[in-house]
């Protein structure tokens, strides 16, 4: 009899928190990561993102830099008080040297300029998850909890 070894990719999808005040960007990024087998969790602003991280397991955050109330970096600072290892990808329309410096000091995995390239985002998501949690099964058929494996 074959013994099963359970890993995160075998038993559940990674939850990707996508926070952007632009609904179109937020939903498009959600569709991109969902098509790859991840579970998107959408937030329209930083305070909502913090609340989500307080109440459910999140494995990676994709944060818009410029949002009302809290910037992406301010949001990251707050969510890291809850989950100190949470990897983050920052998206921005203005990737200045100063912003890059701030992101580096905040241990952001990567800064992605807008408009975002879906392939680049997916590659960075997989790399950030892999660096934090170990190798990631990139197959879009990752089963959700309770679903049979193919």
What are the language-model segments listed below?
Residues 67:
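Receiver (REC) domain active-site loop signature in two-component systems and cognate sites
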Residues 98, 116-126:
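C-terminal output helix
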Residues 51, 73-85:
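Short amphipathic alpha-helix used as the core "switch/output" element in two-component signaling
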Residues 44-48, 71-74:
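Acidic catalytic/metal-coordinating carboxylates
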Residues 74, 95-111:
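Alpha4 helix (beta4-alpha4-beta5 surface) of REC/receiver domains from two-component response regulators
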Residues 23-41:
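Two-component/phosphorelay signaling modules centered on CheY-like receiver
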Residues 56-62:
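Active-site beta3 strand of CheY-like receiver
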